[in-house]
């Protein structure tokens, strides 16, 4: 099922999705397989798999996404970026994605390894909108029409490289006008930021689903590193709570999980079409969050939590 079909079918219940990343080691890959059993037991609608820069974990991205869909029976999506890829290489990757039975892609410009400045690849692309256009031209040429669901990223607090919110929103509209079906936002810790962003996207004429992305805080060190990379702000009250937990990761984790539950509840109450959780390749905290959300009556979630999947083969 393509991305957009989930949100058309899910009007009576929120669409729940997870994001994982491909481990760099064989041991990490083995651990992820175990974690996937637990994540699949929560029955997300789909799982996305991030894309390693410069070939670091690109093959594993496709391997994991194919495993999730073809062996675990859950829809999955590969991330695809412009980093280090020529147009011919993108075509080759798109063919491999298609041949693996995958039909959804998260199209991003991507960040270079090491946090350096982005350099446009030779015969490649600089912007996410160019990548979306390339995907649409590829599928028209290869398959005669739209074949993939395509999601792109949105920034409630503005992309760090944009000159301001107006330019950033114009860039997002360009990605949607070029062919994106879905917008998944960067993480945020104040729901007012998301609601304002959603309002601005609608005013700009963006009609595709705009889905909030939530990342549970699991330690003070983790969130400092991630927010420094993506530009997300930490509200003063949350900062004060985390400052009290600098030497206690368990306490910081409690703060993070409680905040994520509170955010998710409000988002669902306000009628968002779904929530995309950045799960950090762990399952215990996500299970706790899912069990705390008001999903049971609307979506039959009581039959999903911990139920597992008898068809799992890992």
Indicate residue ranges for each PLM-predicted region.
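Catalytic cores of alpha/beta
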Residues: 85-98, 167-171, 196-199, 219-225, ...
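Active-site pocket-lining/capping segments in soluble small-molecule metabolic enzymes
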Residues: 3, 123-144, 151-161, 205-257, ...
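Conserved beta-strand positions in the central sheet of alpha/beta enzyme cores
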Residues: 17, 48, 106-107, 184, ...
């Amino acid at each position: 099922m393509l991305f957009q079909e989930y949100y058309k079918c899910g009007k009576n219940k929120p669409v729940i999705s997870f994001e994982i990343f491909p481990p760099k080691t064989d041991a990490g890959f083995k651990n992820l397989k175990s974690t996937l059993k637990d994540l699949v037991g929560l029955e997300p609608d789909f799982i996305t798999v991030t894309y390693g820069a410069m070939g670091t974990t690109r093959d594993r991205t496709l391997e994991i996404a194919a495993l999730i869909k073809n062996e675990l029976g859950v829809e999955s999506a590969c991330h695809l970026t412009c980093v280090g890829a020529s147009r011919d290489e993108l075509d080759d990757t798109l063919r491999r994605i298609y041949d693996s039975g995958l039909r959804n892609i998260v199209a991003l410009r991507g960040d270079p390894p090491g946090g350096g400045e982005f350099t446009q690849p030779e015969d490649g692309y600089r912007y996410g909108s160019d990548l979306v256009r390339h995907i649409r031209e590829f599928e028209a040429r290869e398959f005669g029409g739209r074949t993939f669901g395509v999601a792109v990223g949105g920034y409630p607090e503005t992309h760090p490289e944009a000159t301001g919110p107006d330019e950033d929103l114009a860039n997002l509209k360009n990605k949607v006008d070029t062919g994106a079906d879905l917008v998944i936002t960067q993480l945020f810790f104040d729901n007012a930021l998301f609601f304002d962003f959603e309002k601005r996207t609608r005013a700009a004429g963006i009609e595709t689903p705009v889905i909030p992305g939530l990342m549970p805080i699991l330690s003070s060190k983790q969130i400092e590193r991630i927010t420094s990379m993506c530009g997300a702000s930490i509200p003063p009250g949350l900062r004060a709570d985390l400052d009290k937990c600098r030497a206690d990761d368990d306490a910081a984790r409690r703060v993070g999980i409680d905040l994520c539950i509170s955010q998710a509840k409000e988002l669902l109450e306000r009628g968002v079409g779904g929530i995309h959780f950045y799960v950090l390749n762990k399952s215990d905290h996500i299970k706790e969050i899912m069990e705390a959300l008001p999903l049971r009556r609307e979506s039959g979630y009581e039959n999903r939590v911990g139920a597992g999947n008898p068809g799992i083969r890992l």
